[in-house]
């Protein structure tokens, strides 16, 4: 029997590479992880499993507003 060589090549993500190299510590990384967990918890899972559609709508509007204002703030900071 011959074994077939897999054509799939694993490439680690940037986050995995930073953890492996020991560069994942720091306040910015901690904030990034908290925001990512908050996003996945409240923006992705809750609207589909636990919330009524009216509550889900307002949660979506809240996160989109925060994102839009953050994006505007970054652009204003960079260009003005």
Curated annotation (Swiss-Prot):
Keywords: Endoplasmic reticulum, Lipid metabolism, Membrane, Sphingolipid metabolism, Transmembrane, Transmembrane helix. Disruption phenotype: Lowers the level of total sphingolipids and increases the phosphorylation of YPK1 in the ORM1 and ORM2 double knockout background mutant. The chain crosses the membrane at residues 54-74. One of its GO terms (cellular component) is serine palmitoyltransferase complex. The keyword Cytoplasm does not apply. It comes from the Eukaryota. Disulfide bonds: none annotated. Its main location: endoplasmic reticulum. One of its GO terms (biological process) is positive regulation of sphingolipid biosynthetic process. GO terms for molecular function: enzyme activator activity. It is a single-pass membrane protein. It is found in: Endoplasmic reticulum membrane. The keyword Lipid metabolism applies. Interacts with the serine palmitoyltransferase complex LCB1-LCB2. Component of the SPOTS complex, at least composed of LCB1/2 (LCB1 and/or LCB2), ORM1/2 (ORM1 and/or ORM2), SAC1 and TSC3. Stimulates the activity of serine palmitoyltransferase (SPT), and thus plays a role in the biosynthesis of sphingolipids. This is Serine palmitoyltransferase-regulating protein TSC3. The gene is TSC3.
């Amino acid at each position: 029997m011959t074994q077939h060589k897999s054509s799939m090549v694993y490439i680690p993500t940037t986050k995995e590479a930073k953890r492996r190299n020991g560069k994942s510590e720091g306040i910015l990384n901690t904030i990034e992880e908290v925001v990512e967990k908050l996003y996945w918890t409240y923006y992705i899972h809750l609207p589909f499993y636990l919330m009524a559609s009216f509550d889900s709508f307002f949660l979506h509007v809240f996160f989109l507003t925060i994102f839009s204002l953050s994006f505007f703030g970054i652009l204003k900071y960079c260009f003005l």
